[in-house]
Regions:
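Short aromatic-enriched loop/helix-cap "lid" or pocket-rim segments at secondary-structure transitions
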Residues: 163-169, 216-222, 266-267
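Conserved class I S-adenosyl-L-methionine
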Residues: 154-176
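Conserved S-adenosyl-L-methionine
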Residues: 202-213
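Conserved N-terminal segment of class I S-adenosyl-L-methionine
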Residues: 1-118, 222, 230, 247-255, ...
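A short SAM/SAH-binding and catalytic strip from SAM-dependent methyltransferases
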Residues: 122-135
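A short glycine-rich, Lys/Arg-flanked "PGG" loop and its adjoining helix->strand segment in the class I
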Residues: 136-151
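Acceptor-substrate binding/catalytic loop of class I
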Residues: 176-191
Length: 300
């Protein structure tokens, strides 16, 4: 039974909201991070390139489910959203209000396995990667749950320095880093991310950049700073201080999983002994996966 306007207002006020939703009757949820509103609109626009019709969809870091509900609206046959901090507002209010079949689970992405979750045609992975302490393991967990020819839409804070675009880069800021946020710890650049996912049989299909913003160190002082300033007078085309590494923006990518796309389908060692990709995957799992760590019998 649909709630009245007064009941909706009262219900919305019981929860804290990350996403903004129009519930009708002039009632909306009030986001705690309204500065992200334009970025969410940007993400939704980019997702027009994804065909959700009849697809099984996983939304990682779903929060209140903005993209989960949108995937369902665009024709997905099944949508599962996972988050470390399950949105009770989404479960108790939004899903019933929208008469939605979206499922939401409190779950860490490192717990993802095909055995427990199955595989998905589309995986949405927005605003999470740059928070991961173990990005390679997290990406592997996700790709293992992606169907062959499946699509992953990945959005993250990225290093977009034009001076390093030809270098496979992963920046892990520490101490007095200009990234200036304690949970923001993993910043790939586009080439670094594409190369990493290529090793996991994923091909980059499309890329978009949202409002590049330059983040720089505070102006340096002392003899070394004065020497650099002198160098810039002599070589005026040098990049501005701090921009060489620390250009940051949000980017969204579409990757497609294709078996055999990895350039390292076989691994050559100095002994010229060759091992299959299946052996390499088994080695990775036995080394890093706590559930299979006991199985050390790896055969070429």
């Amino acid at each position: 039974m649909k709630k009245t306007r007064a009941e909706l207002i009262e219900a919305v006020g019981r929860y804290r909201w990350y996403h903004t939703f129009d519930l009708g009757e002039g009632v909306t949820t009030t986001s705690q991070v309204p500065l992200f509103k334009d970025m969410w609109a940007f993400n939704l626009k980019c997702l027009e390139s994804v065909d959700f019709r009849g697809k099984r969809v996983l939304d990682i870091g779903c929060r209140d489910g903005l993209f989960s509900f949108e995937a369902e609206r665009r024709g997905a046959r099944e949508v599962i959203g996972i988050d470390n901090d399950l949105s009770t507002g989404a479960v108790e209010l939004l899903i019933p209000h929208f008469d939605s079949k979206v499922q939401m689970r409190q779950m860490n992405l490192y717990e993802l396995t095909p055995e427990t979750m199955g595989r998905f045609d589309v995986i949405l992975f927005f605003g999470v990667l740059y928070h991961l302490r173990y990005p390679f393991w997290g990406l592997k967990r996700i790709i293992d749950c992606l169907e062959e020819q499946g699509v992953m839409a990945l959005e993250s804070g990225m290093n977009v320095s034009p001076y390093l675009k030809d270098v496979e880069l992963l920046v892990c800021p520490v101490e007095r880093s200009p990234y200036n946020e304690p949970t923001s710890c993993t910043f790939f650049n586009q080439l670094g991310l594409a190369t990493t996912l290529r090793s996991m049989d994923c091909r980059l299909e499309q890329a978009w950049t949202f409002r590049p913003e330059r983040t720089q160190f505070k102006p340096a002082r002392g003899p070394w700073a004065r020497l650099k300033q002198l160098g810039r007078r002599i070589f005026p085309k040098l990049p501005p201080s701090g921009s060489l590494i620390h250009d940051v923006a949000r980017q969204l990518f579409l990757f497609r999983k294709e078996a055999g796309h990895a350039t390292s389908a076989e691994y050559a060692y100095p002994t010229q002994e060759r091992f299959s990709k299946q052996w390499a995957d088994a080695y990775w799992n036995a080394t890093h996966d706590e559930h299979t760590r006991g199985d050390r019998k790896l055969k070429p």
